[in-house]
Amino acid sequence: ERLVGSEMCIRDSIPGERPDEYVIVGAHFDHLGVDETLANDRIYNGADDNASGISAVLQIARAFLATGQKPLRTVIFAFWDGEEKGLLGSKYFVQSCPFISQVKGYLNFDMIGRNNKPEQPQHVVYFYTAAHPVFGDWLKQDIARYSLRLQPDYRAWDRPTGGSDNASFALCNIPIIWYHTDGHPDYHQPSDHTDRLNWEKMIEITKAAFLNAWNLANENKY
């Protein structure tokens, strides 16, 4: 589909067999910009927050296309602006989207590239809507089936309305999954550089998340 955008988001999609059902894979692309008052490094690069998340969305879109298969539901790949200012892009989308009631699931990425626990370099927090326990089952099964090198902290959340753009969708009662590797000393600092990312873990998270997205797009029920 043609890439479309506004001041609040950029998105593209792969049409599905069911024109009235959608899933969304998203991450925010904004960060903090430049601070001229700083003495040394003034650029907030945002490697983890949230170039890491954007990279996952792009690779999942690429993987969907590589299958050559049409998904059951239309898959929208979205890049939100204004997350750092209060989830502005995703809020705008859910408030203005004419088919929001037909969105069956949302997969979010925000900060998936660091090691909050240096002694556990494969650690990742896996948030998901508690009313959909199968989301936890999916990841457990895929880690075992494909020997994915991840150690998830499974966090089922009754109403996952905090933290990131997942909140905008949860407030619309849309089930969510959110990958996150927790905070670190470079959070919202100019020192959030690419040389501090755990690239191997990002790859494993992206593999696991593609399988999540595939299930969201193709499972009849969850």
Q: Each predicted region: which residue ranges?
A:
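Soluble non-cytosolic domains of exported or imported proteins
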Residues: 44-55, 69, 84-88, 129-134, ...
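Single conserved hydrophobic/aromatic residue that forms the stacking wall/gate
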Residues: 1-5, 9-10
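Sec-exported extracytoplasmic/periplasmic mature domains
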Residues: 59-69, 95-99, 140, 144-148, ...
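His/Asp/Glu-rich mid-to-C-terminal helical/loop segments that flank catalytic regions of hydrolases
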Residues: 62, 66, 183-222
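Short acidic/His/Gly/Ser-rich catalytic and metal-binding motifs that mark active-site loops
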Residues: 31-37, 114-119, 185-189
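Catalytic-core environment of secreted peptidases
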Residues: 11-78, 95-98
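Second-shell loop/turn segments in exported
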Residues: 38-50, 66, 79, 121-130, ...
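Metal-dependent peptidase/peptidase-like ectodomains
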Residues: 80-182
